[in-house]
């Protein structure tokens, strides 16, 4: 075929656009996702800070993957120091808030535990971070024709935003499923160790009881009378 490589139509159309216009594509989706897993020792409290703009969306989801009774205290505080969320002895939680301008603080508190450390997973989803409007304006500056193969650039932008939004949602779901899988695996391993421990204990008890029963029965049939000479 002469070494030609055919691209899907949206990619082919984007490849013909100016380079500066393609740089504006970085502003398609103003959504930022990040997840972390850390170990919180017994008797300790760990806090994190997240700067947020005005009227954005902050979603926090957390799970206790391993340790003790899989429980933790969770606190979410506004930039003014006002308590937004206060949960005690929870294994998981999801919270979404509309933000003010400033630094939000969220803490995981394990001070109630004196023995068990906790493995904690949490994910942050930041929406409406103020980049979408600027990204769309960058596109519109380079629109010179009202029609490109009967498809408007706004339609392409909407399609790309929809695809990226769905991909982001799929990645979010996969991250949560991995966290659930890790927690379930830890629970199964803990149950496995407990079953093995108590099985060994029961086996030892059965052996000791059997030995006592054999000794008792044997002593009942022994002739303890001394023979006279």
From Swiss-Prot:
Where primarily located? endoplasmic reticulum
Q: Which UniProt keywords apply?
A: Endoplasmic reticulum, Golgi apparatus, Membrane, Protein transport, Signal, Transmembrane, Transmembrane helix, Transport
Record's signal peptide:
1-27
The reply on keyword Transmembrane is: yes
Q: Where in the cell is it found?
A: Endoplasmic reticulum membrane; Golgi apparatus, cis-Golgi network membrane; Endoplasmic reticulum-Golgi intermediate compartment membrane
Q: Pfam families from the entry?
A: EMP24_GP25L
TM ranges are: 197-217
Q: Where is the GOLD domain?
A: 45-126
Which parts of the chain does the record assign to the membrane side Cytoplasmic? 218-229
The text of the family note is: Belongs to the EMP24/GP25L family.
What protein is this chain from?
Transmembrane emp24 domain-containing protein 5
GO terms (BP aspect) = Golgi ribbon formation; protein transport
Q: Does the keyword ATP-binding apply?
A: no
Ranges per topology, Lumenal: 28-196
- Subunit comment: Interacts with TMED9 and TMED10.
**One GO cellular component term:** endoplasmic reticulum membrane
InterPro entries given for it? Emp24-like, GOLD_dom, GOLD_dom_sf
According to Swiss-Prot or TrEMBL, what is its membrane topology? Single-pass type I membrane protein
What organism, scientifically named, is this protein from? Mus musculus (Mouse)
Which gene is transcribed and translated to give this protein? Tmed5
